[in-house]
Structure formats: C-alpha cells, structure tokens
Amino acid sequence: FLDMGMFPVFPGLAEPPSNSRPKICILSSGYMLGRAHDVYKKLIEDKYEATVVDVWKVKPLDLQHFSRTVAPYDILVTLEEQTLSGGFGSAICELITDGSLKKSVLRIGLPEKYIFENGNREHLLNTNGLSVEEIYEKIVKFHRCQK
C-alpha cells in the first residue's frame, strides 16, 4: 500500500472482540500488509473476529505496547515474505515467551528451502504458499484446532 501512496487503516483494533470464538490478530509489516488486509476481508465475510496490526517497527519490539495490543486476541498470526526461521514470526514468539503471554501463534512465511524459480513478486509468493487463499486456509484450519 505504501508504494501506491496509500496508508491503510484497518478496523477492529480499538474494539474488543465480542463473542466466545477464538479471536484472530494478523501481525504483519511492509508489503505483506496488503495480503493481510485481503485475508482479513475474507475472514470478516465468513464471520470470524479478526484484525490486522501493522508492526511497522519490527525490532526492537516493546513488550508493554505489544501486550496491550494483542490482549483481546486468542490467536496471533504472523505473516512475512521471508523464511520463518529467525524472522519476524520468531521475534514475536520470543516476545510472547519472554512476556509469559498465553497466546496461540501461527507463523506464515516462506518455506526453508531454495527457490529455483523466476518471476515477479506476486508469482513467487503465490507459488510458495503465500497466496491470499492459501494464507486464509491456513488461518481457518489453525482456528478450527483452537476451539
């Protein structure tokens, strides 16, 4: 969005979720915010309680601010366009552990493998498990396991 001159504001963060189903908070930054927002719209259409948080500063992470932000949510989903080991999702998991927060975490990112394929960003993300539909399906499957 930022590369298109838009600064998105995602609804839901300021309002505590209301029902007893596990609530979903998608944490992302940069380019993947667009995909996070598209997934968010699908989740809302299908009656899931969800929000998207732009973690615009990945490091250092502030435990107090983070704790307040994610307090109403049961499931945290980290969405990144790099490999999972040592990435954004790992930093979030460390913060959750260090703060003794009780949250279920689903990390979504690129697989830990060499990608020997050429193409633009959209093509490479879509062919490596980061299409909007695949992200949505991973979240819904994880959500079902948390009930």
What name fits each language-model region?
Residues F1-K147:
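Thiamine diphosphate
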